[in-house]
Structures are given as structure tokens and as C-alpha cells.
């Protein structure tokens, strides 16, 4: 017999919600949560669906945060089975979103239903927040909802994000923060000319090389708590016409910083602009701020999560701030303590994405235990 969480996960996977599409996932979830007594509010913006569902009232406010969108699967022929036709083989569920993160979303729903059935008059507020704009631009999703919450004065005390955080077994890692992310697109201007007459041209590659070398060599910090040191990586670089006898007129450089709480986007931007100015470059520089770092220090949420995950996994979890960004970066500035707890992440964004059925079926109890420890 198929378990409730497995069936719901399959129903969600079958809805091909490639970002920013939701494909009916949130309507299905809202129907279930409404039937369980949750008040559901749809906060759609443009092509993005956002769902805010609450049960109870007052403080403390505990939010289960997730996303219903998925990354594109690529050619279906590369998959062993249709990425949007979920299939269980040898105790493993395959399909796009199985691990990232429709399994966690389904487990949130089942855990929330079970919790309010057992504790209909529970203290505080249990909330579920879902978006279809996590894997894409992340502008009209939780970023937008967080702005609405700030305007409303919506308090959030604790936030559990269901991102796939585990590495080898369910519960072996507890995400307690994330680095900030800042991207820059730099264009260094020169003067195009013939390579035989360099005195009549200005080579932007040569002009920029010392500045780029300084950026790459810089030790930005030594890390922070469990954060690795801030890192700057050049991701793309382009210049030239394709001909080997033409000095290019401009150099294009794309770079990204993943940074610790020692910094914020504004201070990093100032540092880099000052460096470029010292090298007397003629340039333009466009920034994209993906999110500031966040960190949950030792406290109730972190202690409870460590104890619950340790009981489930059989050993205390590693407490980490690694990985990319998540939507928790938009909730943390509201004053919330944020953690991330979810299934094994080995196959996310890959062909034949999958999750162990045993892990999936354990997730609702894991989330329900966290909710009970925090609210009851």
C-alpha cells in the first residue's frame, strides 16, 4: 500500500512545474491544508505562485518553507524514465523534484496535518510558505513575500526550510546558515587596434590583468564560526574578435563572491570599486545581489533540531553553513532563526533525480517531531 507522503510526492512530481510554473501544485496543497483547518492565502505576483497557510495564532510563529518549482529536466531521453512520470524502482523514487524539493513539501503537508489533528489548540502559529520562484530569478517569490511581511509586521520566530541538506543518510547534516552571494559583470574599456601597432591601441586585457590578479589573490577573511572564508571566483571572461591580429576594444569579466557575515553586499562593492579605481581602469560594473548571509547561533531552534536529527540519524548531525543559497536568506532578515533540514542531496538537479522511499516516509515524522518540540 502506498503511503500518504509517497502518493502526495508522486502527485506533485507529475505536475511539471518547471520554474516559475507551479502547475497546480499549490492548489492541491491548499485544498489539503484548508481541509485540515489552515487559513490559506495566495500571494501570486506575475507568473509566480506563492502560498501562505497558517494554523493557530500568536507567537511563537514557526514556518515550514519550501518551493514547488523545479529545474528543467533536460532531454527526457537521458532519463531512465519520464522525469514527470514518478516511478519507484528498488525502493527508490525517481522524478524531477523528488529530492529538490517536492518530497520535503509533501512531508511538510503530511506532518502539518498530523500535528494539527493531534494538537488542534496548539500554542502559537504553524505556517507553511511555498513559492514557485526558488529555482529561477527568485524575485517574485519569497523575496516578494518577505517584503509584504515586513510591511504587515508579520513576526516569524523560527523557519525550517526543507532543502535537501543531508549528504549520505537522512538527518546527518543540519544547515545553520548560508553565505551571501554577490555577482558582478565588469566591462573594461580599451582602444581596439592592430597588434603590430600597440602604441595606437590600449589593450584592456593587459590593463585589467593586474587588478584581476589582485582580486583573485586577496584573502577576504578567515571565515566566521562554521563559515568557510569568503571566496571570489571569476566565472566568465571574454575579449577579442576571434582574429589574432586585433587588439580588443573591451574585456568582459563575470565574477561571484560567496561571503561570510563579516561582509555585506554594500561593503564588498565598495572594496572592489576602490581596487578598480586604484588601477585607473576605464570600466562599467553592474551588480546583482542574490542575498546576504545568515547564521543561526546556538539557541532553541538549533538545539532542538540537533537533538531531533541526532535521534533520527543515530548520531549528532554535522552543523554546516556550506552550499549555495536558499530562500531562507529572505526570511532571516525578518528576525527569524533559520535552519535547513531535508533529504539526501546527491542527485539534485541531475538526470534521474531520486530519493529513497524509506527516507521519504521518515520525513513527516521528523518534521512533526520538530514542530511538536517547538510549539507544544
Swiss-Prot record:
Cofactor: Zn(2+); Co(2+)
Pathway(s) of this molecule: Amino-acid biosynthesis; L-lysine biosynthesis via DAP pathway; LL-2,6-diaminopimelate from (S)-tetrahydrodipicolinate (succinylase route): step 3/3
Entry's Gene Ontology molecular function annotations: acetylornithine deacetylase activity; cobalt ion binding; succinyl-diaminopimelate desuccinylase activity; zinc ion binding
UniProt: Zn(2+) 1 binding residues: 67, 100, 163
Spans through the membrane: none
Keywords (A to Z) from UniProt: Amino-acid biosynthesis, Cobalt, Diaminopimelate biosynthesis, Hydrolase, Lysine biosynthesis, Metal-binding, Zinc
Any single biological process term in GO: lysine biosynthetic process via diaminopimelate
Cofactor binding notes: Binds 2 Zn(2+) or Co(2+) ions per subunit.
InterPro entries: ArgE/DapE_CS, Bact_exopeptidase_dim_dom, DapE_proteobac, Peptidase_M20, Peptidase_M20_dimer, Peptidase_M20A
Top-rank taxon: Bacteria
Pfam family, one: M20_dimer
EC number(s) per entry: 3.5.1.18
Residue sites binding Zn(2+) 2 per the record: 100, 135, 349
Keyword match Metal-binding: yes
Catalyzed reactions: N-succinyl-(2S,6S)-2,6-diaminopimelate + H2O = (2S,6S)-2,6-diaminopimelate + succinate
Active-site annotation: 69, 134 (proton acceptor)
Biological role: Catalyzes the hydrolysis of N-succinyl-L,L-diaminopimelic acid (SDAP), forming succinate and LL-2,6-diaminopimelate (DAP), an intermediate involved in the bacterial biosynthesis of lysine and meso-diaminopimelic acid, an essential component of bacterial cell walls.
PANTHER family attached to this UniProt entry: ACETYLORNITHINE DEACETYLASE, N-ACETYL-L-CITRULLINE DEACETYLASE
Similarity comment: family membership: Belongs to the peptidase M20A family. DapE subfamily.
Subunit structure: Homodimer.
Stated name of the protein: Succinyl-diaminopimelate desuccinylase
Organism name: Xanthomonas campestris pv. campestris (strain B100)
Amino acid at each position: 500500500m502506498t503511503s500518504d507522503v509517497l502518493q502526495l510526492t508522486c502527485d506533485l512530481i507529475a505536475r511539471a512545474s518547471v520554474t516559475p510554473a507551479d502547475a497546480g501544485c499549490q492548489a492541491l496543497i491548499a485544498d489539503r491544508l484548508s481541509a485540515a483547518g489552515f487559513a490559506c492565502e495566495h500571494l501570486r505576483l506575475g507568473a509566480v505562485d506563492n502560498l501562505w497557510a497558517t494554523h493557530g495564532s500568536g507567537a511563537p510563529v514557526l514556518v515550514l518553507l519550501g518551493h514547488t518549482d523545479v529545474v528543467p529536466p533536460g532531454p527526457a531521453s537521458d532519463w531512465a524514465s519520464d522525469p514527470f512520470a514518478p516511478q519507484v524502482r528498488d525502493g527508490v523514487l525517481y522524478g524531477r523534484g523528488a529530492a529538490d524539493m517536492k518530497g520535503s513539501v509533501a512531508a511538510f503537508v503530511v506532518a502539518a496535518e498530523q500535528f494539527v489533528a493531534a494538537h488542534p489548540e496548539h500554542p502559537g502559529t504553524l505556517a507553511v510558505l511555498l513559492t514557485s520562484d526558488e529555482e529561477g530569478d527568485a524575485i517574485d517569490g519569497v523575496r516578494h513575500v518577505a517584503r509584504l511581511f515586513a510591511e504587515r509586521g508579520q513576526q516569524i520566530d523560527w523557519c525550517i526550510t526543507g532543502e535537501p541538506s543531508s549528504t549520505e543518510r537522512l538527518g546527518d547534516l543540519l544547515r545553520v546558515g548560508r553565505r551571501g552571494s554577490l555577482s558582478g559583470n565588469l566591462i573594461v574599456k580599451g582602444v581596439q587596434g592592430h597588434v603590430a601597432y600597440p602604441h595606437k591601441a590600449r589593450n584592456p586585457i593587459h590593463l585589467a590583468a593586474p587588478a584581476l590578479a589582485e582580486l583573485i589573490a586577496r584573502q577576504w577573511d578567515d571565515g566566521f564560526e562554521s563559515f568557510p572564508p569568503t571566496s571570489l571566483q571569476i566565472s566568465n571572461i571574454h575579449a577579442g574578435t576571434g582574429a589574432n591580429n586585433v587588439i580588443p576594444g573591451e574585456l568582459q569579466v563575470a565574477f561571484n563572491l560567496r561571503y561570510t557575515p563579516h561582509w555585506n553586499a554594500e561593503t564588498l562593492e565598495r572594496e572592489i570599486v576602490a581596487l578598480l579605481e586604484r588601477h585607473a581602469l576605464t570600466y562599467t560594473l553592474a551588480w546583482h545581489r542574490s542575498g546576504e548571509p545568515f547564521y543561526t547561533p546556538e539557541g532553541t531552534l538549533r538545539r532542538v533540531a540537533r537533538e531531533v536529527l541526532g535521534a533520527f540519524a543515530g548520531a549528532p548531525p554535522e552543523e554546516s553553513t556550506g552550499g549555495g543559497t536558499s530562500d531562507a536568506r529572505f526570511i532571516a532578515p525578518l528576525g527569524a532563526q533559520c535552519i535547513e533540514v531535508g533529504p539526501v542531496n546527491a542527485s539534485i538537479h541531475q538526470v534521474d533525480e531520486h530519493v529513497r522511499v524509506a527516507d521519504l516516509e521518515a520525513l513527516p515524522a521528523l518534521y512533526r517531531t520538530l514542530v511538536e518540540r517547538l510549539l507544544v
